[in-house]
Amino acid sequence: MDKFKRDGEEYISYQRRFLYPLLFQEDLYAIAYDHYFNRSSCFEPMENSSSNDRFSFLTVKRLISRIHQQNDLIISFLNCDQNPFVGHNSSFYSELVLEGPTVVLEVPFLMRSKHSLEKKNEWKSFRSIHSIFSFMEDKFPHPNSISDMRIPHSIHSEIFIRTFRRWVRDAPSLHLSRSVLHEHRNSSENLYKSILIAPEGNTKFFLFLWNYYAYECESLLVPLRKRSSHSRLLSYGAFLEQIHSYRKIEHIVIFSRRNLAKSIWSLKDSSISYVRYGERSIMALKGAHSSVRRWRYYLSIFWRCYFHFWSQPYRIRIDELSNNCSSFLGYFLGVRMNTSVVRIKMLDDLFITDLITNEFDSIAPIIPLIGLLAKERFCDISGRPISKLAWTGLKDDDILDRFDRICRNIIDYYSGSFNKDGSYRMKYILRLPCAKTLACRHKSTIRVVWEEFGSELFTKSFPKEGELISPFFSKTCSQRKRIWHSDILRINLPANFWQNKRNRQIETLFGL
């Protein structure tokens, strides 16, 4: 494919028109098998693997021949209950066949991404969960409102095909994708005849659909064409992993195509900071309340016209920071006033005044954290500690290690919040459950456990207040600065928990 990079037109023509023959190459399914095996091995222990999951290229070759004869055969193949061809291991091969078209569809997507990144990109973009902390540390001169959005994830299957046709001109590949999507739509589980996609998709195919769909949803924030925008030229760089993203746009004026004279959106004085985790996204806006409401109208019109569905009102909510806070991934986001003493000397006079500035701040919620510990049976709803009876059969070191990991996860996750007392309060709540669990294991009392293990018990398991993992920062510095720990394995777990909890609250509130 490198030879087609010399000529742009010929290169684009190749990547759009000749994808379907790749479906019948055995090497493609070898790559798909490697992707499937690597992903499965990360979540499944070795003792659960079976010899029945062995891969057979002969079976794949027969499937390729059948797909080559008629595309409709993939529909009967994807139905594992009615497909005796591959035997008892049909589920394994059905997922593998979905991996193959995904690898093919990723070819133009990767080329499109690389072609966009070769251009000058003036955006500051980050693609990991740590971009959320950069968002919380960002400087907002005058943040007035926060728009809490939830990206719709119920899309008609034909909408994906129509969006694919804009950059994939290979008709057989589109027909094959349509067959797969329509078969999924017509299954008994999808009563509304739509495709439910989410960032935590269990297959590579639906994860690719989410990445592409998120890219299309976020493209509305960018002035893609000069005729529809009048601003400093910003090139939009496509990215493959779109589970997490961070965008910041400044000084945008958006024009309507119908009537430029009357439909000018006065957003040139607004500053937008955008962050997304999964299907939830946050935009911090400044400006008048009417200007902020126009953004919600803009998003609703875009979803209705581009994806052909009505956006529910609960998916876009605007909170004014001056009145209340907004919750995102277990943090309360609000504005905190920072007062600075300024001395002004003019000739012989010295004036002292207070300079008040607003800072965008994150707060650790105390009551939800207590509710989280109560759900895991570490305390009751009032915060009174109780013993973990299920762990009494473990060794002392295992019990201490489990409590240590839980405490470390909470402290690391809220290490950069303004009120660090909330995370340290969770530490003291976990002290007594640890002691009670050890007391139940040894059939003694908490006093006996304390005398036996001594004060080193909690000193070893729990860090002291103000203690940092990194030795490069002093204790005085940690009290003044907010330091985010970058252990992504520990951070992702609380983030996913708060994300799912927030989604359930919204669905319960609106009777979904």
UniProtKB/Swiss-Prot annotation:
Pfam families: Intron_maturas2, MatK_N. It is found in: Plastid, Chloroplast. GO terms for cellular component: chloroplast. It comes from the Eukaryota. Keywords: Chloroplast, mRNA processing, Plastid, RNA-binding, tRNA processing. GO terms for molecular function: RNA binding. InterPro entries: Domain_X (IPR024937), Maturase_MatK (IPR002866), Maturase_MatK_N (IPR024942). One of its GO terms (biological process) is RNA splicing. Belongs to the intron maturase 2 family. MatK subfamily. Usually encoded in the trnK tRNA gene intron. Probably assists in splicing its own and other chloroplast group II introns. This is Maturase K. It comes from Ginkgo biloba. The gene is matK.
